[in-house]
Amino acid sequence: MQILQPPNWPRPNGFSNGIAARGRLIFIAGQIGWDEHCRIQSSDFSEQVRQALKNIIAVLAASDGKPEHIVRMTWYVTSKREYLASYKSIGKVYRELIGRHYPAMTAVEVAALVEDDAKVEIEATAVIPD
């Protein structure tokens, strides 16, 4: 995996501008902050992020993948304000579960998610090396 950083661009904080990779592609559907029984256990934004990331890790593990194989994430949040207010705690949760691996990322505020109590949904793409 190669991180793509154009010359003279400032280094991004917490994500990469691009990733080049070869291997088996894994596409992970949007994961929300519910557990394996489809129950949201917390209304706290950071805790929903924690569970969504745990769900991504579980799907990856089903294909012998690891967090460092993630090349792209798209975060859908229902409140930009709540996302930004939780930024430090989200970063702590992210580093705890994913480590200091920062794939290409996008965050988008949406009007709502399909599950009423969900505050965040995260899609991921991973490449497991050949």
Segment roles from a protein language model:
Residues 1-71, 77-130:
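N-terminal presequence-like segments and the immediate start of the first folded domain
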